[in-house]
Each structure stands twice: as structure tokens, then as C-alpha cells.
């Protein structure tokens, strides 16, 4: 089986590529950075180093790469692939879909061999986003081919892959935490139903929101509060008593909302929550708060990790005091080397916090939640 993975970064190599190798796929990475592409083609292997109390090293072999700009090589890979996956950020799915559209049109004219396309992004229903980008502008013949031969299962992906400074044999070796989870929509898969380490589930919604709220939302909150208190790493910030109390409260609020919405046993959610809190404390990861907090413009958007649980709690009349800390602290994330963070700060400086909340989180000025976020923002600002 042949796999084509867009995005040869740490997640691509250390998580998706790692599991595809364990499942006996011949994997080709696609990336825009010449150095990464050249290194993968030079070494044709890399090591995945697991960071925990004992370091474990596993080789990933039989890999190669093509440059995103090499349309001839890329077309050949799309024509031959049994599976296409991505880990390049939600914002890049539209352009990726537009690129794939032409290659899939060519493939449809040659054969109707089944294919699965899975967007492995930190977002809700990312494969649907990619599918829409491909369908927009597709002719009727291509639409029929996609309906018949191509599966677009949504998924959740969960593995912390920090930019930690470790001793490497090769520049493309990658360090990861020892936990991972990949949940895939079972009923939309065409042929790739035996990926080792992946769980195929009937209903994905609870898994998506559980992960988005309890991992991504809480993780970002630790980063933003940790930044305000001057911590460098996540494991340091979560040990701060005040931050820890907020994160435990964040989880408690989100767990209640998830249980009520999806009818999940609250005890199962609490067990998942406890596992996550231990993962956040993993000092071997040395996960920088600036990395975890990166791109608050996206993380504070209306359908992402902080605003979604906030709105759900509000709708269900569940207390959201601690989730509010996460949102407000995100608007105070003023990391100078983060272009998106500076973009938010510029809006706040020129037009005020309420306008920034309206622009970034799509919560209108005058709305109850806009006022609540703005109030908490001003409160935190005075304290820091």
C-alpha cells in the first residue's frame, strides 16, 4: 500500500508517518521546504524518540519525499496512492484541495482505484473542509468519481510533538511523547481500515470535541497563563498552583458540557481528563509555552479549542469561569515573535478588546460573551 502525506513536519514524521510505517505503508512525504525534502531523500529513514522516564527509539524506514513545487512528481504520487493524509494546518487545506483537484481529475480518467483522503489536523471535521475545497470547481465527472471511489473520513489526532532540543543522529529524527491517539470515521473509509494504532469509530463527534476541549483547549490555556506568569515550559506552568486550579476547573466545566451534549458517562471523561493532566506534567517533553500558544488568531477563532467549549457551556447554562480564563489570557498573549499574536495586539491597540473579540472570535460587540471575555481580559491585564 502506498501513502502520500502532505506536511513532513514533526507531526507528519513523528505521528502519522510513524504509524503508517508500522502498518507497512510505503510513505512519500510532500513538503515545501527543500532542506526537509532533501534530507528525507538522502537518508530514506529517521528515528522517532519517545520522551518519558525511559527514552525509546524506533526506526522509520522506506520513506522518501517530493517537493510541493514539483508538479510532475506530485502528480505521479497522487495517481499511485492508496491513501493521502495531511498535517499542514487547517489554513492550508483550501490550497491543498485546489492542488489535489487537478491530480484527482487525471486519476479519474486513468482508473477508479479506491482511495482515502484523511486530513489529520487539530480542527473539527478537517477532512470535510478538504473535500469541499476539492469539490469547489470540480466538474460533474470528477464529482461522480469522488463519490464512488474516494473516502474522506474525518479523524481526531493526538500526540504532543514538541520542538525539544535532543541529541539526534539525523536532522530529521523527531522526539514525541509516549501517548498517541488516532480516531477515524469508520463508515467513510474505502480501503484503509487496518492502520495499526488507529481506532475506527462509528460516531466521531464525541471524540473530536473531547480532544479539542480537554487537550487542545486546556493546553492552550496553560500556555497563555504560563506566558503571563513568565514560565518557559508547559510542565512548569501546570505545576503553578493557581494555573493548575484553573486547568482542573476548565476540565470540570468542559467534562460536564461534553457529558450532557454527547450522553457520555461522566466517569469515563474524568478518567480521560486525569490522563491528560499527567501528560501536561511530562517534564521530558520540555514543551515551550510559545509553541503551544502559537497562532492565537486561529486558536481563538469561533470553531476552535477555546470559543467552542465556552459557547457550549453558555448554551447549556454550565459555569464557564475557568474556560473564560483561557480565552481572555489568549488575548493577552503578546509573544513578539508570533506574527498572529502581534496581529491581535494591533487590533486591540487600534480598536479595543471588544472589537478584537468580534473580529477574531466572531462574537459581536454587545453580546453577553463578548462582554464577559472583555471584562476578564481587563481583570487579567491589571494583574499582570
From Swiss-Prot:
<protein>
    <recommendedName>
        <fullName>Mannitol-1-phosphate 5-dehydrogenase</fullName>
        <ecNumber>1.1.1.17</ecNumber>
    </recommendedName>
</protein>
<dbReference type="InterPro" id="IPR008927">
    <property type="entry name" value="6-PGluconate_DH-like_C_sf"/>
</dbReference>
<keyword id="KW-0520">NAD</keyword>
<dbReference type="InterPro" id="IPR000669">
    <property type="entry name" value="Mannitol_DH"/>
</dbReference>
<dbReference type="Pfam" id="PF01232">
    <property type="entry name" value="Mannitol_dh"/>
</dbReference>
<dbReference type="InterPro" id="IPR023028">
    <property type="entry name" value="Mannitol_1_phos_5_DH"/>
</dbReference>
<dbReference type="InterPro" id="IPR013118">
    <property type="entry name" value="Mannitol_DH_C"/>
</dbReference>
<dbReference type="GO" id="GO:0008926">
    <property type="term" value="F:mannitol-1-phosphate 5-dehydrogenase activity"/>
</dbReference>
<feature type="binding site">
    <location>
        <begin position="3"/>
        <end position="14"/>
    </location>
    <ligand>
        <name>NAD(+)</name>
    </ligand>
</feature>
<dbReference type="Pfam" id="PF08125">
    <property type="entry name" value="Mannitol_dh_C"/>
</dbReference>
<keyword id="KW-0560">Oxidoreductase</keyword>
<dbReference type="InterPro" id="IPR013131">
    <property type="entry name" value="Mannitol_DH_N"/>
</dbReference>
<dbReference type="InterPro" id="IPR036291">
    <property type="entry name" value="NAD(P)-bd_dom_sf"/>
</dbReference>
<dbReference type="InterPro" id="IPR023027">
    <property type="entry name" value="Mannitol_DH_CS"/>
</dbReference>
<dbReference type="InterPro" id="IPR013328">
    <property type="entry name" value="6PGD_dom2"/>
</dbReference>
<dbReference type="GO" id="GO:0019592">
    <property type="term" value="P:mannitol catabolic process"/>
</dbReference>
<comment type="similarity">
    <text>Belongs to the mannitol dehydrogenase family.</text>
</comment>
<dbReference type="GO" id="GO:0005829">
    <property type="term" value="C:cytosol"/>
</dbReference>
Amino acid at each position: 500500500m502506498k501513502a502520500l502525506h502532505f506536511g513532513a513536519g514533526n507531526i507528519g514524521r513523528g505521528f502519522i508517518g510513524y504509524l503508517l510505517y508500522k502498518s507497512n505503508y510505503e510513505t512519500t512525504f510532500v513538503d515545501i521546504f527543500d532542506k526537509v525534502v532533501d534530507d528525507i531523500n538522502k537518508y530514506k529513514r529517521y528515528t522517532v524518540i519517545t520522551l518519558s522516564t525511559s527514552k525509546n527509539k524506533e526506526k522509520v524506514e522506506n520513506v522518501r519525499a517530493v517537493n510541493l513545487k514539483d508538479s510532475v512528481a506530485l502528480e505521479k504520487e497522487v495517481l499511485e496512492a492508496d491513501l493521502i493524509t495531511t498535517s499542514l494546518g487547517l489554513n492550508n487545506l483550501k490550497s491543498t484541495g485546489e492542488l489535489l483537484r487537478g491530480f484527482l481529475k487525471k486519476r479519474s480518467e486513468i482508473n477508479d482505484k479506491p482511495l482515502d483522503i484523511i486530513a489529520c489536523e487539530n480542527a473539527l471535521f478537517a477532512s470535510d473542509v478538504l473535500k469541499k475545497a476539492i469539490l469547489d470547481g470540480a466538474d460533474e465527472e470528477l464529482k461522480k468519481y469522488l463519490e464512488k471511489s474516494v473516502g474522506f473520513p474525518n479523524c481526531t489526532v493526538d500526540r504532543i510533538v514538541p520542538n525539544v532540543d535532543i541529541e539526534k543522529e539525523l536532522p530529521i529524527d523527531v522526539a514525541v511523547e509516549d501517548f498517541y491517539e488516532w480516531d477515524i470515521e469508520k463508515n467513510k473509509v474505502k480501503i484503509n481500515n487496518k492502520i495499526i494504532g488507529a481506532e475506527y469509530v462509528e460516531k466521531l463527534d464525541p471524540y473530536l470535541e473531547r480532544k479539542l476541549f480537554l487537550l487542545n483547549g486546556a493546553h492552550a490555556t496553560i500556555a497563555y497563563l504560563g506566558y503571563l506568569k513568565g514560565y518557559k515550559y508547559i510542565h512548569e506552568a501546570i505545576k503553578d498552583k493557581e494555573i493548575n486550579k484553573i486547568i482542573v476547573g476548565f476540565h470540570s466545566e468542559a467534562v460536564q458540557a461534553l457529558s450532557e451534549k454527547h450522553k457520555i458517562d461522566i466517569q469515563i471523561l474524568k478518567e480521560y481528563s486525569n490522563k491528560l493532566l499527567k501528560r501536561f506534567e511530562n517534564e521530558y517533553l520540555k514543551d515551550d509555552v510559545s509553541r503551544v500558544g502559537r497562532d492565537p488568531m486561529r486558536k481563538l477563532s469561533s470553531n476552535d479549542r477555546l470559543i467552542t467549549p465556552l459557547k457550549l457551556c453558555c448554551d447549556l447554562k454550565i459555569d464557564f469561569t475557568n474556560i473564560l480564563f483561557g480565552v481572555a489570557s489568549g488575548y493577552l498573549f503578546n509573544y513578539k515573535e508570533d506574527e498572529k499574536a502581534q496581529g491581535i495586539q494591533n487590533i486591540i491597540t487600534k480598536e479595543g478588546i471588544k472589537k478584537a473579540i468580534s473580529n477574531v472570535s466572531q462574537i459581536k460587540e454587545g453580546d453577553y460573551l463578548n462582554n464577559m471575555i472583555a471584562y476578564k481580559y481587563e481583570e487579567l491585564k491589571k494583574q499582570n
